Design a protein with these regions (language model features):
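Alpha/beta-hydrolase fold catalytic core
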Residues: 2-4, 10-13, 18-78, 313
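Conserved HGGG/HGGXW glycine-rich cap/lid loop of the alpha/beta-hydrolase fold
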Residues: 68-116
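Flexible "cap/lid" loop of the alpha/beta hydrolase fold
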Residues: 156-164, 171-199
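Short beta-strand/loop motif that positions the catalytic acidic residue
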Residues: 254, 260-262
């Protein structure tokens, strides 16, 4: 199963890299043309308005490019960093942000090797460089003893950051973290996402949403549009290939309070993920959200929000 998954990813990378060599219009790590990038950014801005709370957007210069950070919530609130899922960007938090920003100072960061408003000006980053990049952002904002929420791939990055000897993280929330405790649970089902990248179409996109969400009809149309354009226009990269489940020792090194949430129809995680989390994370709580898929923060927003807020406060 895993071999099938990685073969599909490799085929995707070969096809898209050949296409980018042939059709590249300008120097951008993510997008082929200026018009495609602008169309995507217009969709991003529309989706971000779904936050429906006051926020500011800031760009932070780093050693590897520009980090785009969206800030919201009370200035005297405890700092809460949000790391989104793959290709989802910080706009994905629209069903959760009002609850999260009520008592916390939010720092939502777009990952610089994916579609979004962060921009990569260096070569693709290694895991070590990803840690450096985020730490530069944390240092810029002088974040100490902050809480962090990571969704899907953002959950994997969160565990990567928390497993470092020197970090300033306090409480951790993982929303169906990808490739973190085990490899993807249902490889054949998730292959729809890879096929979407290979041959993007509205039909394949909707099928992918049906795979990852129990209630795709509840996903806002503006956010759907942005997410679709991310899959349609963005070049693929090999970062997913570098994601491996963390070792027993790496997980045991994390002493922070951790909450792990997955959906009962999750195609990325299963109860085995929660069992391993409970076994090797020394201070861990887990919960399975009913009638939710991998997109549990959208499928069951209120239940997810309540569980997260109760844990953080």
């Amino acid at each position: 199963m895993q071999n099938l998954y990685f073969r599909l990813v490799l085929i995707l990378l070969v096809i898209t890299s050949c296409s980018s060599i042939k059709e590249a219009k300008f120097d951008d790590y993510i997008f082929e043309t200026k018009s495609e990038k602008q169309s995507y950014l217009n969709a991003y801005d529309k989706a971000l308005k779904l936050w429906d709370i006051p926020y500011t957007e800031e760009n932070v210069k780093t050693s590897f490019g520009t980090a785009h950070v969206i800030i919201a919530g009370p200035k005297n609130g405890k700092s809460l960093v949000l790391l989104h899922g793959m290709d989802a960007t910080s706009t994905m938090w629209y069903p959760n942000i009002k609850a999260l920003a009520k008592n916390h100072r939010i720092y939502a960061i777009d990952f610089l090797m994916e579609p979004g408003k962060s921009t990569l000006t260096a070569k693709p980053l290694s895991s070590k460089e990803i840690v450096i990049w985020y730490n530069e952002i944390f240092s810029f904002y002088k974040l100490k003893q902050f809480d962090i929420i990571g969704a899907s791939k953002g959950g994997w990055i969160t565990v990567l950051l928390a497993s470092q000897e020197k970090n300033s993280i306090d409480k951790i929330v993982l929303l169906s973290p990808a490739q973190t405790f085990k490899f993807i649970d249902k490889v054949r089902k998730t292959s729809s996402a890879l096929l979407l990248k290979l041959f993007p179409s509205e039909k394949k996109f909707n099928k992918t949403l049906e795979t990852f969400s129990t209630h795709p009809q509840n996903i806002n149309s503006n956010y759907k549009r942005q997410f679709y354009l991310a899959n349609k226009y963005a070049k693929s990269n090999s970062s997913m290939l570098k994601m491996r489940p963390f070792s027993d020792e790496e997980l045991q090194s994390i002493v922070n309070p951790v909450l792990v949430l997955i959906g009962d129809h999750d195609v990325i995680n299963s109860e085995e993920s929660l069992t391993r989390a409970q076994k090797f994370l020394t201070n861990c709580k887990t919960q399975t959200i009913k009638d939710a898929g991998h997109f549990l923060s959208i499928d069951q927003a209120k239940i997810t929000n309540d569980a997260v807020i109760n844990f953080l406060e």
